[in-house]
């Protein structure tokens, strides 16, 4: 498995911060995964709910009884490092950190982002983010839409990577 396959071609994924609360990123990501027809297993992670959008939820990735290829992290930035530690202990090699609150608000956030980068490198993980739009794979074999752009992308065989959320969202919309 290549380093990009960990992110773009997962057979299972956890949404850390999955939610039943409407109009939250954790809720929107869950809905998009289902609506776009993700072909793998989805494990909602939320310590307060036993079920998210009709799926069994787990308090932590460590409680999931199956292997997980990738984690989409949509929790408060101050909890992200702990979530990354748990992902490492679970053997998850690909993470997408949608959470904001890293270097964009200032020095404290920049330090938090530096710690995240160090952990990702130490653990040998592939990471997209933090503070990103998410990831999409339009290949019908995977049908992965773990982002919060306005519209669902057309299925097909074109790849696209964008550092800019505005540009990426514009292309997807």
Model-predicted regions and their roles:
Residues 1-173:
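Catalytic-core regions of core metabolic enzymes
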């Amino acid at each position: 498995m290549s380093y990009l396959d960990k992110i773009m071609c997962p057979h299972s994924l956890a949404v850390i911060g999955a939610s039943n609360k409407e109009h939250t990123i954790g809720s929107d990501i869950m809905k998009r995964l289902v609506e776009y027809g993700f072909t793998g297993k989805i494990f909602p992670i939320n310590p307060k709910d036993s079920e998210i959008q009709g799926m069994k939820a787990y308090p932590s990735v460590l409680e999931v009884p199956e292997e997980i290829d990738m984690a989409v992290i949509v929790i408060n930035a101050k909890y992200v490092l702990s979530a990354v530690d748990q992902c490492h202990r679970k053997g998850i090699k690909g993470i997408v950190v949608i959470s904001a609150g890293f270097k964009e608000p200032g020095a404290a956030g920049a330090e938090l982002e530096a710690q995240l980068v160090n952990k990702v490198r130490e653990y040998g993980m592939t990471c997209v983010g933090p503070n990103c739009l998410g990831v999409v794979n339009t290949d019908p074999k995977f049908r992965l839409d773990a982002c919060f752009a306005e519209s669902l992308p057309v299925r097909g065989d074109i790849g696209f990577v964008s550092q800019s959320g505005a540009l990426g969202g514009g292309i997807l919309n």
